[in-house]
C-alpha cells in the first residue's frame, strides 16, 4: 500500500476518534464515531430517528464535492431515510469520494440500562486508545520505511549509470545519488515537456511535477508539489540518473551556485552513437580535473565524458559508491593518446569515444588512484605510479640456494655410468679436523670391493625396470579385454586354470567322452559357474574371441556343451566316490573293533573292579556306598582325590594294587604254575616270610633258618613281580588302541557322508535316465555313467546298511557299561575311555620313575636307618610295602646279632 494511503487512513481514523460530537458541521462524523466504537445511554441529539427502525435496509450514498456539499447532502439523506442504522464503514482517498454505508437492522432488543452503558463506554474508550496507539505506531513505521527506502544507499539498480560532473558548482565534490522513478509514480507527459522545455530557460527556481497515482490508490491530483527542498539538498552534487542500454531518457542540469534557491533543470537527451572498439590494451587512466575558471572563460559547458572505467571512481570523491555489478564487465577501451600540442593548451583534452558496451562500476571500497594521463604532467602534480599490468614481466625472486661444498663434491664424483644400487640407510658423521678419529687411519686404497658382484646383488635399476614393464604389459592387457563374468569370479577361475594347466579342449573332450578330470578343477568350475545372465551373454557374444579375458575365453569354449554342469557333477561324483567310500568303510571297521576291544578287555574290567571296591570302601556307611556299578566318567575323577601326604592320589593306589596282582599272575603264568588255583598276592608271601622270621627268633634251636641272603633274594623277587605288573598295566593303552581312534570320529559326520553318497547316486541315476536319454546320444560319457551307476548302487547300499548296524552296535556298547539310559550319547563313551587312558599312562610313568629311584637309593643306603629315612623323605612317592620290608630286615638283623652274642657268652 502506498504511503499516501497510510496517511489518509490515519487521518480519517483520528478524525473519527478525536472530533467532538457537538461540533457544528461535523455532527455526522461524531455520530458515526459514537455508533462505531461505543454506544450511549440515550439516543443522539441530532439523529433521534436512527434507533427506532425495525426493518433492515442497506443504502449506499456517495458524497461529492467539497466539505459543504458533503455535509448538506448527508444531512438531507439522513433525514429522508425511513429508519436508522449503524454507520459501518467510511473510506476516503485522494480524489475518490467518501462512501458511507448505512446498515439498518432489526431492533428487537430492549434498551440497555445506564449502568451497562457506562461499562460499555469504558470498554470502548480502552479499545479506542489501543487502536489509536497501534495506528500511530504503524504510521511511524511506514514513514520510517519510506525514509529508509528513499535513501540513496538502498536504491540499487544493475543498469549502467550516467555521470555528470558539476564543473561550475562551488564545490568539487560529487555525490552519486540514484533516483528510482517508479518510487515517485509515473511522470505525466506534461512533466516531461516541462523538464525538456526548461533546459534553455535557466531562470526557474522550482519545478512542478504532476504525479499519476497508481491504479490501486484512486484518482488523485497532486498539483503544485514543490521540489525546492530536494533541489537544495542536491545542490553542488553530482546527480546520476538511471539510463537504458545506450540511451539516456532524463538528465539533470547543473545548478548555478549564485542562485538563491537551487533549480533543477534537465539537459537534452538523445541517442549516443556507439564508436567502433579500439584495439585491446590496458584500461585507460581517469581524465584529469579541469581548472575552475575553464568554463567561465569560454562561456560554455564541457561535453559530458564517457563512463569511467572500473576503479576510476573510487578516488574521485567521498560520495556514496555505486552498487556492485550483477555480472563482471570487460574493461573499457583506452582513449586515444593526446597530442603534445593539446597537452600544453589551456583547454582539456577532447572526450574519448564511448565504449560499445557500458562498463559496470566496481564494488564500493577504497583503492589507489589511477595514474595521470600523458598530457597532465604540465597541469598538475603526478599521482601514484601505475600498478603492474597482468601480462607484464614478473618481479625477480630471491636467488636460488647454493649447494654445500660436500654435496657439490659428491655430485661431481658421482659417475652417471654406474648402476644404481639399493639405498643403505645409515647415520653420517662429519669428520672433525681438530680431533683425531679412527677414520683418519683408513686409507682410500686399502680395500677394493668387486663392483660387478655388488651390482648383481644389490642392483635396483633392473628390478624397477622389470616391474614397470610388467605393469605396462598388464595394463595394456587389462584395457583390451572384454569383461563378461564377475571380476572376482574371472580372476579366481583364471588362476585355477593357469595352476592346473588344463585347456578348454581337454575339458570339453572329458565332458563329452567321460574322461577323468582332476577333482580340484571340477570343483573350481562348479564353484565359479556363471549365472544365467552371464551364460546368456557368453552364448550371444559375437565379437572376436581374442578380445575376451582368459576366463571368458575358457567358459565360452565349453558353455555350449549340453548339460555341462550336470556332467561335471557326475564326473566329480565318479572321481570322489571310491575315496569317500573307502574312508567310511575304514571308520566303520574301526568302530566295530573298538566296541569289541572295550567289551572284551580283561584288564579294563580288572581296573573297574578295583575302582568299584575302593569306592565302596571309601563310601562305606554313607548313601553312596554299596554301589554295584558306576558311570565311566568316574574314572576321570580318580586323579583328583589325594591322600594325606598331598602327593599320592587314589589313582596311584589303584594302579599299585593292580600292578601287584598282575605281577604275581604274570610270574606264575611264566613259571607254568597256578593254572586253576587262585592267584596269591605279594602280601601273603611277605606274611609268610615274616612268620618264618618270628619262629626263628622264638626258638633257640632254629637260629640258622633264615639269613640275610635269603631275605634279599625275596626282595629281588618281589621287585621283579612289580615290574611285570607295571608292564601289564601300561599295555592297557595298546590293547584299546582302536578305542582311541574311534574317539576321534564324529558319528553325525559319518551319517551325513553316507546319506550324501546315496543322494548323489540317486541324482546321477535321474540325470542318466532323463537328461541323457533326451539327448539320444551314444557317447563315452553316457556309457561310463551307466556302468558307474550300476556298480555304485551295490556299494552305496552296503554302506547305508553298515551305518545302521554300527549305530546299533555303539548303542549296545554304551548300554553294556552304563545301562539302558535311553539317551543317545553317540561316541562319547570312547572319548571318556581315551581321556582316562591318557591319565593312566602318566601315572604308570610316575610309578616306573619311583621304582628306579628306590632301587638307586637301596644301593646307596647305609647300615644306620638315618640315611634311609633321609632318602625316603627325598622321594616323591613312598611305597608302603617297602616300609614293611625295611622293618622286617631290621628285625632279622637284630635277631642275628642277639644270636651271635649268646653264642659268645656260652
Swiss-Prot record:
InterPro entries: FH2_Formin (IPR015425), FH2_Formin_sf (IPR042201), Formin-like_plant (IPR027643). GO terms for cellular component: cytoskeleton; membrane. One of its GO terms (biological process) is actin nucleation. GO terms for molecular function: actin filament binding. Residues 267-416, 854-906 are annotated as: Disordered. The chain crosses the membrane at residues 120-140. Residues 274-292, 320-339, 348-375, 383-402 have a biased composition (Pro residues). Residues 293-303 have a biased composition (Basic residues). PANTHER family: FORMIN-LIKE PROTEIN 18, FORMIN-RELATED. This is Formin-like protein 18. It comes from Oryza sativa subsp. japonica.
